[in-house]
């Protein structure tokens, strides 16, 4: 299973917020933003910062996808 951040990108569109604005508002590092863009694993702390910034829950920004399908 791998993490998918498609929900995060859709939420940003819905909130009319750019990835750059999320980066600044959440205080995430550039390397964490790059990991998110590449669909790589990020820390729970990074996900917590995003949730606080967007006023949402973790299930609103990430889902786990079965790679075997």
List each model region and its residues:
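Short amphipathic recognition helices of helix-turn-helix/homeodomain-type DNA-binding modules
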Residues: 61-69
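Short alpha-helical DNA-recognition segment
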Residues: 16-34
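Residue-level detection of the helix-turn-helix DNA-binding "recognition helix"
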Residues: 13, 27, 38, 66
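A short, Lys/Arg-rich alpha-helix, primarily the initiator
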Residues: 1-20
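The alpha-helix within a helix-turn-helix
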Residues: 12, 23, 37, 51
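Hydrophobic micro-packing sites on short alpha-helices
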Residues: 49-51, 61-62
């Amino acid at each position: 299973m791998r993490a998918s951040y498609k929900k995060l990108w859709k939420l940003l569109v819905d909130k009319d917020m750019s990835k750059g604005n999320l980066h600044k508002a959440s205080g995430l590092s550039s390397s964490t933003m790059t990991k998110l863009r590449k669909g790589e694993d990020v820390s729970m702390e990074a996900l917590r910062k995003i949730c606080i910034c967007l006023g949402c829950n973790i299930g609103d920004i990430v889902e786990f996808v079965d790679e075997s399908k």
